[in-house]
């Protein structure tokens, strides 16, 4: 417990990336309903193009993100976190373009392209967590991250976008405009993401370098690990 939660780099990393998933899960959930409302198309057509674009973009994005993360790690102890910045600065403008374009097929294309960025980061938090704890603690650290990511990202992202859409609709917006505005507004959480990533970047080199010393101070037998 102390190895995980007394590491500032660990805590900031565990909070930063779920804020990205807050957006990506929410956008993934509401993209199809939004396009159906905006462009008056069938669920079959939207589902086919959105599904294929998300699957292919996600496959390429997560693979490229992992490769980039390992490359960046070789250059700087906190290098993997750069993938988080890339995800934010790639996802935000592309999602805005997707929800505000007047062309349905441009929206389909942008759905694919934004997944190259929005799906690039999932391998970064667990690999970063593994660098900050002893080998026997990696599963626990990963489990804590999955719990936080599930609660903040998977549970809250789609829900909060829907609630915000209902709030806008209650002011007189139609269902399409209210949902579009809700998606756009929730991108503001990326401000918190950037702050948390920067704090994690600041503390990660020291926390990783002091991993064995921190474990020894907590009474762990680190001789075998050090060997």
Segments and roles (model prediction):
Residues 6-65, 110, 114-126, 153-165:
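Extracytoplasmic gate region of multi-pass secondary transporters
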Residues 42-45, 79-82, 163-189:
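A membrane-interface helix-boundary motif in multi-pass transporters
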Residues 73-75, 129-138, 171:
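Paired intracellular helix-loop junctions of major facilitator superfamily
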Residues 85-102:
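C-terminal ends and interior cores of transmembrane alpha-helices
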Residues 86, 92, 180-199:
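Symmetry-related core transmembrane helices of the 12-TM Major Facilitator Superfamily/SLC fold
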Residues 200-227:
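Intrinsic disorder in cytosolic terminal tails and internal cytosolic loops
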């Amino acid at each position: 417990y102390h190895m995980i939660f007394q590491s500032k780099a660990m805590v900031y990393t565990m909070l930063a990336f779920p804020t990205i998933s807050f957006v990506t899960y929410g956008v993934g959930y509401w993209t199809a309903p939004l396009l159906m409302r905006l462009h008056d198309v069938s669920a079959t057509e939207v589902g086919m193009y959105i599904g294929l674009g998300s699957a292919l973009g996600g496959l390429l994005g997560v693979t490229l993100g992992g490769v980039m993360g390992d490359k960046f790690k070789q250059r700087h102890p906190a290098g993997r976190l750069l993938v988080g910045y890339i995800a934010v600065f790639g996802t935000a403008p592309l999602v805005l373009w997707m929800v505000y374009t007047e062309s349905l097929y441009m929206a389909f294309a942008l759905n694919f392209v934004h997944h190259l960025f929005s799906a690039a980061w999932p391998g970064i938090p667990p690999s970063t967590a593994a660098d900050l704890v002893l080998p026997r603690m990696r599963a626990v650290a990963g489990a804590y991250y999955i719990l936080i990511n599930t609660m903040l990202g998977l549970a809250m992202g789609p829900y909060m976008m829907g609630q915000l859409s209902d709030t806008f609709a209650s002011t007189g917006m139609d269902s399409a405009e209210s949902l579009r505005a809700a998606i756009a507004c929730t991108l503001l959480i990326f401000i918190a993401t950037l702050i948390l990533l920067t704090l994690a970047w600041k503390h990660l080199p020291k926390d990783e370098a002091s991993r064995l010393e921190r474990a020894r101070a907590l009474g762990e037998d680190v001789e075998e690990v050090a060997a």
